[in-house]
């Protein structure tokens, strides 16, 4: 079998396609959650803690002071952008919560399905029956 043929068989298997769809949907979901955090959640949290915009919180590790984060970045100053880290952490927590809720719902659906009935045992083959009869006859002698 050629390399290309093997790759086609691998790529067209159901679980590989499912994985690809999951990655694409996950990427889109990540963008939605990122927007939710940056544009909805963090402005509300910032307002509740005194009008702070978390995106602009940073520590300047250099000796020169700058008015804004953008000015410090433009000058190439060494920075610790802990506001961006807070945003990313909240972003992660929301994604983790959404995945947890989705998996919990899927598991609940799986539990509510009745278990599949156990298959009936296959009838014993004739040669096995004959061998048992011979064994039993030999035991009685």
UniProtKB/Swiss-Prot annotation:
Pfam families: MscL (PF01741)
Record key words, sorted: Cell inner membrane, Cell membrane, Ion channel, Ion transport, Membrane, Transmembrane, Transmembrane helix, Transport
Cellular-component GO terms for this entry: plasma membrane
Membrane topology field: Multi-pass membrane protein
Transmembrane segments: 16-36, 83-103
Protein function: Channel that opens in response to stretch forces in the membrane lipid bilayer. May participate in the regulation of osmotic pressure changes within the cell.
Family: Belongs to the MscL family.
Assembly and interaction partners: Homopentamer.
Stated name of the protein: Large-conductance mechanosensitive channel
